């Protein structure tokens, strides 16, 4: 900055909160994807080596992809927030463009939150079979054999659930921003009754 130019005012607390929440959501979703993606354990059972990997449970694989996509989306949105504030200087700009960006952000935030929550719940449901077994189908409890894999998968799913909760809060921030930018209604014309 030049010596004579005033500093731009700091962003409002809601903008700072949104930035922190976006960074936290990106970090938690990335942590969940990494924990699940790198979880693997090999055990030898009766002279046969068997490796447990996330691809064995398709719901885990889908969760890894969804969490990684959500982390990338929130990192990109965080970069957009920082760039838009720097370029616009906190105000001005095209109102129509800002409304369109707010609408797209709202829809994408909602979709991202739903996607991560749905895939996490599906992975939890699939993993409960491995945790508890199904006696009617004679499926044994796999977490007794692959304990480290199950613990790492559980930690990844907890990270994904926390990220999904944060994304739900972020979609509320997006909704507030969208409706704050909407066009005001034209003044109501009062009709006089005769």
Curated annotation (Swiss-Prot):
Localization per record: Cell membrane
Annotated InterPro entries: CASP/CASPL, CASP_dom
GO CC aspect terms: plasma membrane
Top-level lineage group: Eukaryota
Membrane side Cytoplasmic: residue ranges: 1-27, 80-113, 174-194
Membrane topology, record value: Multi-pass membrane protein
Major subcellular site: membrane
Residue ranges that the UniProt entry lists as topological domain Extracellular: 49-58, 135-152
Ranges that cross the membrane: 28-48, 59-79, 114-134, 153-173
Record key words, sorted: Cell membrane, Membrane, Transmembrane, Transmembrane helix
Assembly description: Homodimer and heterodimers.
NCBIfam families membership: A_tha_TIGR01569
Family note: Belongs to the Casparian strip membrane proteins (CASP) family.
Name under which the protein is recorded: CASP-like protein 2C2
UniProt organism field: Sorghum bicolor
């Amino acid at each position: 900055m030049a010596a004579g130019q005033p500093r731009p005012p700091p962003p409002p607390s809601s903008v700072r909160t949104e930035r922190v929440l976006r960074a936290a959501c990106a970090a938690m979703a990335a942590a969940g994807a990494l924990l699940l993606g790198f979880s693997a354990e090999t055990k030898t059972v009766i002279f046969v080596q068997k490796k447990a990997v996330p691809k064995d449970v398709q719901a885990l694989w889908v969760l890894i992809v969804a969490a990684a996509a959500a982390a990338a989306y929130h990192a990109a949105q965080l970069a957009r927030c920082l760039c838009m504030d720097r370029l616009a200087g906190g105000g001005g700009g095209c109102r129509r463009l800002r409304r369109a960006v707010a609408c797209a952000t709202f829809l994408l935030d909602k979709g991202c939150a739903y996607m991560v929550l749905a895939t996490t719940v599906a992975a939890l449901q699939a993993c409960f079979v491995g945790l508890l077994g199904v006696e009617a189908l004679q499926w044994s409890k796999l977490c007794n054999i692959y304990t480290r894999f199950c613990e790492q998968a559980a930690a990844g799913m907890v990270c994904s659930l926390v990220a999904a909760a944060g994304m739900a809060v972020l979609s509320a921030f997006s909704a507030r921003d969208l409706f704050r930018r909407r066009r005001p209604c034209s003044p109501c014309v009062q009709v006089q009754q005769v």
